[in-house]
Amino acid sequence: MTEPFLRARHRGDDEKVAEYPPLPVPLTVPVFDNHTHLEIEDGGGPDGTASLDFRQQLDRASSVGVRGVVQVGTDLETSRWSAEIAAHEPRVLAAVALHPNEAPELAQKGLLDEHLAGIAELAARPRVRAIGETGLDFFRTGEDGRDAQVRSFEAHIEIAKQHGLALQIHDRDAHRDVVRVLDRVGAPERTVFHCFSGDVEFAREVAARGWYLSFAGTVTFKNAGGLREALEAVPRAQLLIETDAPYLTPTPWRGRPNSSYLLPHTLRFMAEHLGTDASMLAAQIASNTELVYGRWEDEPVTATSPLSLEGS
């Protein structure tokens, strides 16, 4: 039976659990959340009520014009959970992968190949439409762990190409190395830089290769002028949007738990910054998203859900 959550969000000793923000004004034209983590429990109500489970979060998202989400795995367990949820929930497609920060420890234990084989098996399941999040993260990993990250990244690229799936890139402090690996191995036809964090020149380089750039709530942050310059350089046909929930909550709710239903804040901010109509931008991004992952309705869900939820 699939549980409503797999793990709680890690918080520091001095960090309190905050309540979820209120619903935004619904979008007139719906969009899709390119990247979220519904398996992570976070937040609560003003009176100490429980966190929103994934169904409640999806219901809120639907009510404000977020038609569907890509639920993203970061290890074998969360990837299995993601594939299982997608198989039974029509608003969810799955991405499966080992996060780059998982690779060094798995390699040290001699388990990397076994876990990569598990990802390859999940890639063949219905409604799994992407391999991700994979890539390189040199922020937390030292020199001794980089070879394992590169090996894992290369293997994920091959899995994506073998199954005809999109690739979701995690790139932190590793822009040049990520591009070198993609150029050397050969990027899948539909490659997405999730939570794009580069400058305007890197945005142009990524776009010139035909890859997609997905912007999260970080683009709304006061100190993110460089990221907004990058946004301006992206062709509209290569632009996606995401929450990376429960992280990176957009302004004006930064510091509170994030969820897919808050995506309208980021969409409207991006539209205003780009000097375009929010509905026109939403329509373009929705079209781009379905070009990357296909239509959410293309594969039927399983009729009987195995999900074990309180009160269901």
Task: Indicate residue ranges for each PLM-predicted region.
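Mid-domain alpha/beta scaffold segments of enzyme catalytic cores
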Residues: 1-312
